[in-house]
Amino acid sequence: MPRMPTFAVIGDMHGNLPAFDAVLDDLAVVKPDAIYLAGDYVNRGPQSGAVVERALALGLPAISGNHDTWLASMAHGRHIPTNWDDSWWTPQRLAVGELTPSRLAWLDGLPATLHIELSGAAPALLVHGSPRGSREGMGRMFSDEQAAEALVGVAERTVIGAHIHYPWERRVNGAHIIVIGAVGCPFNGDINAQYGLFAWDGETHDWRFEQRSVPYDHERIYAAWRESGYLDDGSLAAELMLLEHRTARTHYVPFWDWCLARDLPLTRESHARFVAERG
C-alpha cells in the first residue's frame, strides 16, 4: 500500500525562538512531506527579529498573520498610536526596532493564503484567521452560520487556520475546518509548543489532523524576557504577555477589549478594576 502524503502547519510563533526551534527539531524526526508556516511570527514575545530571521532562512512556504501586517505597517510609519511613547506600547516599539530591512521585506512579501497541493491527496487552503481575513478567528465562538459565510467562494474542502492559539475542528456543509494550536503562546492551558500534523486518509478521502505538543526549555524564553528590555520600563502590556507565556491562557486581549468597551485607559488602575470585576 503506498504511503499517504503528510504535511505540517506551524504558526503563531510570536517572538518565541526556543519554542520555534523545538518544533523544528520535532519535525526533523517526524519528517512530513511538506511544512507550511501559518503566520504571526512577531509580537507577544521578546524575540520577534530572531523568529523572523529563522523563518526567512528556512525558505518554507509561508503566509502572513495579523500581527505581522500590523507591525510591518508601523515599521513603515503607518498606524502609529498617538501615545506611542507610553509604556503600554513598549513590546511593539521594541519588536518594530528588530525589523531590519531584509526582515521587513520578507514580511511585506508574504501572501495572505496558500493552496496546499500534495500528490495523491485533495488540496487544502491555508489561512491565518479565516478565508475572509487574518483577524477573524475560527474557533469556539464561530457558529455554523459564520463558518458557512466565511467559506463562501472557497473551492477546497479542507481549510486550515491558526490565530486563536488553541486547536479546534468543525465540519460545515461538507467542508472540514481545522485550526492548529500555537507554537509560541498557546491559550489552551498547555505551555508546550504546539503545531498541526496532517496525513491523508485514502479510505475517507480526508485529511486526518494530529495536534502535536512539544516540550521546550521555558527558562530560555523567560531569560529573553528579562534580557530584552521589554520589562525594563514597567510595561503592563509586557507583563501580561509574559503571564500568557507562563499560563498558556489569554490575558492581554480580554483586558484590551474590556477597556475599549468602557472607554478606559490601558493602565494599572484599569487593570485592577478589570481583575476585581472578573473575580
Segments predicted by a language model, with ranges:
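Ligand/cofactor pocket segment of small-molecule handling proteins
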Residues: 128-172
